[in-house]
Amino acid sequence: MFMGEFLHSIDTKGRIIVPSKFRDNLGSSFVVTRGLDKCLFAYPMDEWKILEEKLKQLPLTKKDARAFTRFFFSGAIECEVDKQGRINIPANLRNYAGLEKDCNVIGVSNRVEFWANDAWEDYVTESEDSFAEIAENLMDFDI
């Protein structure tokens, strides 16, 4: 399980340190792809396989299903952690998420998310203001 929030810098080669707390659960090789809310999602291989199987079940005849799977899989890349605990995030993914210098690496249950620092701070501010309403809307899920 992933939880917590860490601020790291992206170097000039597009590399970022993966927090040591996350490296053990992610493994030496994992998948990074475009996520929702203009961030990147990272999944351990076992979680990626589960998600991949679920997405394969989406009906090919549905336009939204095709669009989502194209978006999700076309942006996916397998990353390996180097000896310094870094991964290289390709330019297309950095551009999608607006990752330039400072990056928030956050744990979200079964995945890790990479956020541009400004975008993350804006998201947190907006979410804090509506957290009670969000929680109320999730009551139907018995949380």
From Swiss-Prot:
PROSITE patterns assigned to the protein according to its UniProt record, in alphabetical order: SPOVT_ABRB (PS51740)
Principal subcellular localization: cytoplasm
One cellular component term from this protein's GO annotations in UniProt: cytoplasm
Residue ranges constituting the SpoVT-AbrB domain according to the UniProt record: 5-47, 76-119
Compartment annotation: Cytoplasm, Nucleoid
Entry keywords, A to Z: Cytoplasm, DNA-binding, Repeat, Transcription, Transcription regulation
Top-level taxon in the UniProt lineage: Bacteria
SUPFAM superfamilies given in the database record: AbrB/MazE/MraZ-like
A Pfam short name: MraZ
GO biological process: negative regulation of DNA-templated transcription initiation
GO molecular function, one term: transcription cis-regulatory region binding
PANTHER family registered for this protein in UniProt: TRANSCRIPTIONAL REGULATOR MRAZ (PTHR34701:SF1)
Family as reported in the entry's similarity comment: Belongs to the MraZ family.
NCBIfam families (UniProt xref): division/cell wall cluster transcriptional repressor MraZ
Summary of subunit composition and partner proteins: Forms oligomers.
Designated name of the protein: Transcriptional regulator MraZ
Gene (name only): mraZ
